[in-house]
Amino acid sequence: MMNVIYAILVLGILGAVFGLVLAVASKIFEVKKDPREEAVLSHLAGANCGGCGFPGCAGCAAAIVAGDAPVNACAPAGAENAAAIAEIMGQAAPTGERQVAFVRCNGGVNAKKRFEYRGVQDCISATKVAAGPLDCAFGCLGFGSCVNACQFGAMSIGPNGSAVVDPDKCTNCGACMTACPRHLITSVPASKKVHVACANQDKGKAAMSVCANSCIGCGLCQKECKKDAIHVVNGVAVIDYEKCVGCKLCTKVCPRDAILPAATAEEKEKYKAIKKAQAEKAAAAKKAAEEAAAASAQ
């Protein structure tokens, strides 16, 4: 009986000693936490999406307080919360237009296939099988890796088979951009409505042969733009959003409907008629000027 009592006493004493050692160690080696971290954390989205590049919202809050991340590092939190975090950190509120994701492909059912893929319905998996089923090496595969990555319900596969973004739901967290194996998703200003929905850098004939909606780098959009807001770069049209005013002239001259929102056939014909009338008027004016000059020379 005494052996049992001694064993209990020894274990109790050891437990007390170890507990005391741990208590002292916790005080000595305690890592002081900045109280601002909790305040910053309360203004983050709480989705732990990882779009900021840090391990969860707590990691993002710690990075902001440490000065390793900007106060607007959490895109889903929005401008209002970014301003609140800036106030906590004693900084000026960040300014800048809201950004949303945009998928640079509108090929879908109009993109030619090399073979019928019947494997795992995932874009990353599909690209590992002979580089994917599409003839176009730049096209959206349409299996929804980006849709699965989005925690805000902003991504879906559109009627034509390509991924599309709901700008009202998009927080520009970047999860879809990371998930896309072809890097087709980019950030664009939310207020801008005209976008080039193609990333194909192949030359005209090659691009034309793989998709009915591909940009062929013809440069008609570049020539038509009055604001110098669109240029062909590496074989594909690129919009300068700082210059673009959304006039949509580029959509009316694009022969491939690669610029969204695509103009209807009626709008294109109407615009062609206007351009023809302008050309005829200019030609008539030039002819009249030449005749007048010839008459005065006699």
Predicted features and spans:
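Ferredoxin-type iron-sulfur electron-transfer modules and their immediate structural context
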Residues: 2-218, 222-224, 253, 257-260, ...
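Strongly charged, low-complexity linkers/loops
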Residues: 220, 230-238
